[in-house]
């Protein structure tokens, strides 16, 4: 079966960073992991309309720092910073005896962010927009923004069909096996009257590590 590995997980430590930047011993590791999961779920649910792409969590002794990457930072920050204070107070109830710092990072090109594209397609499916139209429009916007390639997939009872199926659309190149290829991946679910529809998006943004490649070429030329 042609199952695909998660593109981010495959590249962690090669060209991608960890989303959780902390160390814990055996005694505290499980608690921290569950806490991270609760934090991510809460922020996603609470700020879904703001288009949260990803959440980085850094931990020190009694401090947790969240880097929230969002397409609409104003919606999270709120008027005079009220929104961010409200979010911090709610998160404080989930995390006991720890100070929370929240850093908002703006996603400059939301039309080229795989997670935001997937969520956008899912929202359109919930509004009963045809899945082909939703996918093709997202692909066109992404290609206009300058990405090298994009692939989208919708799985489930598409258009209310009795039998569930998967439909793919792609444009450009998506080198999934090339580790130096910067592949962004996003997943979202649409809750329709016929059940859930899963949306997956792969975006190829170009190769990373060009400097190292040039150094190797110079060394070969000098040899």
Curated annotation (Swiss-Prot):
Coiled coil: none annotated. SMART domains: KH. PROSITE patterns: KH_TYPE_2, RIBOSOMAL_S3. Transmembrane segments: none annotated. One of its GO terms (biological process) is translation. It comes from the Bacteria. The keyword Zinc does not apply. One of its GO terms (cellular component) is cytosolic small ribosomal subunit. Disulfide bonds: none annotated. Signal peptide: none annotated. Keywords: Ribonucleoprotein, Ribosomal protein, RNA-binding, rRNA-binding. GO terms for molecular function: mRNA binding; rRNA binding; structural constituent of ribosome. Binds the lower part of the 30S subunit head. Binds mRNA in the 70S ribosome, positioning it for translation. Belongs to the universal ribosomal protein uS3 family. Part of the 30S ribosomal subunit. Forms a tight complex with proteins S10 and S14. This is Small ribosomal subunit protein uS3. It comes from Clostridium botulinum (strain Loch Maree / Type A3). The lineage of its organism: Bacteria, Bacillati, Bacillota, Clostridia, Eubacteriales.
């Amino acid at each position: 079966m042609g199952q695909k590995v998660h593109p981010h997980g495959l590249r962690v430590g090669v060209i991608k960073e960890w989303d959780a930047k902390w160390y814990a011993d055996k005694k505290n590791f499980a608690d921290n992991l569950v806490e991270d999961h609760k934090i991510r779920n809460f922020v996603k649910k609470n700020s879904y309309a703001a288009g949260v792409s990803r959440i980085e969590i850094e931990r020190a002794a009694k401090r947790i720092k969240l880097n929230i990457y969002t397409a609409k930072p104003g919606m999270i920050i709120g008027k005079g910073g009220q929104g961010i204070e409200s979010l911090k107070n709610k998160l404080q109830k989930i995390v006991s005896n720890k100070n929370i710092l929240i850093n908002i990072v703006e996603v400059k090109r939301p039309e080229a962010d795989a997670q935001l594209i997937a969520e956008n397609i899912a929202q359109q499916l919930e509004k009963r927009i045809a899945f082909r139209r939703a996918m093709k429009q997202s692909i066109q916007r992404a290609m206009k923004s300058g990405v090298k390639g994009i692939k989208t997939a919708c799985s489930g009872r598409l258009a209310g069909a009795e039998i569930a199926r998967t439909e793919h659309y792609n444009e450009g190149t998506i080198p999934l096996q090339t580790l130096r290829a910067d592949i962004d991946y996003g997943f979202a679910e649409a809750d329709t009257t016929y059940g859930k529809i899963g949306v997956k998006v792969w975006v190829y943004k170009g190769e990373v590590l060009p400097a190292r490649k040039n150094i190797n070429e110079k060394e070969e030329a000098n040899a």
